[in-house]
Curated annotation (Swiss-Prot):
Reaction catalysed by this enzyme: sn-glycerol 3-phosphate + NAD(+) = dihydroxyacetone phosphate + NADH + H(+); sn-glycerol 3-phosphate + NADP(+) = dihydroxyacetone phosphate + NADPH + H(+)
Residues binding sn-glycerol 3-phosphate, per UniProt: K110, G140, K195, D248, S258, R259, N260
Classification of source organism: Bacteria, Bacillati, Actinomycetota, Actinomycetes, Mycobacteriales
Family: Belongs to the NAD-dependent glycerol-3-phosphate dehydrogenase family.
Localization annotation: Cytoplasm
Designated name of the protein: Glycerol-3-phosphate dehydrogenase [NAD(P)+] 2
Source organism of the structure: Mycobacterium bovis (strain ATCC BAA-935 / AF2122/97)
Keywords for the protein's UniProt record, in alphabetical order: Cytoplasm, Lipid biosynthesis, Lipid metabolism, NAD, NADP, Nucleotide-binding, Oxidoreductase, Phospholipid biosynthesis, Phospholipid metabolism
Length: 334
């Protein structure tokens, strides 16, 4: 059975990477946190805060930050990859020669790669040559700011190697953060990649002043299309009914702390993609709707909500027009 390193490398000091580094440290681990910018690493080491990405969260002294990837990866048998989905490949190409042989590689990213239509675990295997059993995914209803406040939360650790999954589970079990293992990597990744798109749709509805009935319909019908895509790819439906599916979907669609929902609200209020992006950075769902829709098309899976979000984000359709389009679809059994 694979164990977990006494020092774990978390590659990416954004909100999610920093929050998970804190979880690992609070659970008793020694963590090296890689930041792209040296000033972010220096600030973490000197003040114990990361105000740019996770303001207000005091980071334990067992987290050491660095902007040197070689330093971060040296000797780590477990590497958490906390970079955006669309930059995963480029970062891994730089880091691959530095990765210790046999390391457990853990994706924290939620998305489908544009062009290749690969899930993140597939990108990791493709670039590093790792065995599928070496690759794990962490996903669930995990808003970074709430986790940083030590609010109770649960997540899924998915890996085909049960030993690696259990080792990660133990390393993350901090008292306020409860991990569950699952062998269904595909389902865990599809749930995470698709929920951001549905959260954009929920945000758009809020932005134009619609209420809870609309939000409930979007979440429920959004789940239906996520399950259709997941099962077409071989996912277990139970995974998508659990934390990595329904759980993540509800948190991301309903929380005002959700970046994808907040971005959708701006679009609903009439802001352009460009102006919304300047205010709060373009979110993962904007890119994911393009790659997920292409993936669904390749499997002949119908995803009308994803299609509507894609049209609003990339084809100039207004939110009102998207609603008219969805409500004008042919009626059918649930």
């Amino acid at each position: 059975m694979a164990g977990i390193a006494s020092t774990v490398a978390v590659m990416g000091a954004g909100a999610w990477g920093t929050a998970l580094a804190k979880v690992l440290a609070d659970a008793g681990g020694e963590v090296t946190l890689w930041a792209r910018r040296a000033e972010v690493a220096d600030q973490i080491n000197t003040t114990r805060y990361n105000p740019d990405y996770l303001p207000g969260a005091l980071l334990p002294p067992s987290i050491h930050a660095t902007a040197d990837a070689e330093e971060a990866l040296g000797g780590a048998s477990t590497v958490l990859l906390g970079v955006p989905a669309q930059t995963m490949r480029a970062n891994l190409e730089r880091w691959a020669p530095l990765l210790p042989e046999g390391a457990t590689l853990v994706s924290l990213a939620k998305g489908i790669e544009l062009g290749t239509l690969m899930r993140m675990s597939q990108v990791i295997i493709s670039v590093t040559g790792a065995e599928p059993a070496q690759v794990a995914v962490i996903s669930g209803p995990n808003l970074a700011s709430e986790i940083a406040e030590c609010q109770p939360a649960a997540t899924v650790v998915a890996c085909s190697d049960s030993g690696r999954a259990v080792a990660l589970q133990r390393a993350l079990n901090s008292g306020y953060f409860r991990p569950y293992t699952n062998a269904d990597v595909v389902g865990t990744e599809i749930g995470g990649a698709c929920k951001n798109i549905i959260a954009l749709a929920c945000g758009m509805a809020v932005g134009i002043g619609l209420g809870e009935n609309t939000a409930a319909a979007i979440i429920t019908r959004g789940l239906a299309e996520i399950i259709r895509l997941g099962t077409a790819l071989g996912a277990n439906g139970a995974t998508l009914a659990g934390l990595a599916g329904v759980g993540d979907l509800v948190a991301t669609c309903t929380s005002p702390r959700s970046r994808n929902r907040s971005f959708g609200e701006r679009l609903g209020r009439g802001e352009t993609l460009q102006s919304a992006g300047k205010a709060c950075h373009v979110v993962e769902g904007v890119t994911s709707c393009e790659s997920v829709l292409a993936l669904a098309s390749s499997y002949d899976v119908e995803m009308p909500l994803t299609d509507a979000v894609h049209r609003v984000c990339h084809k100039g359709l207004s939110v009102d027009e998207a609603i008219t389009l969805l409500l004008g679809r042919r009626t059918k059994p649930e």
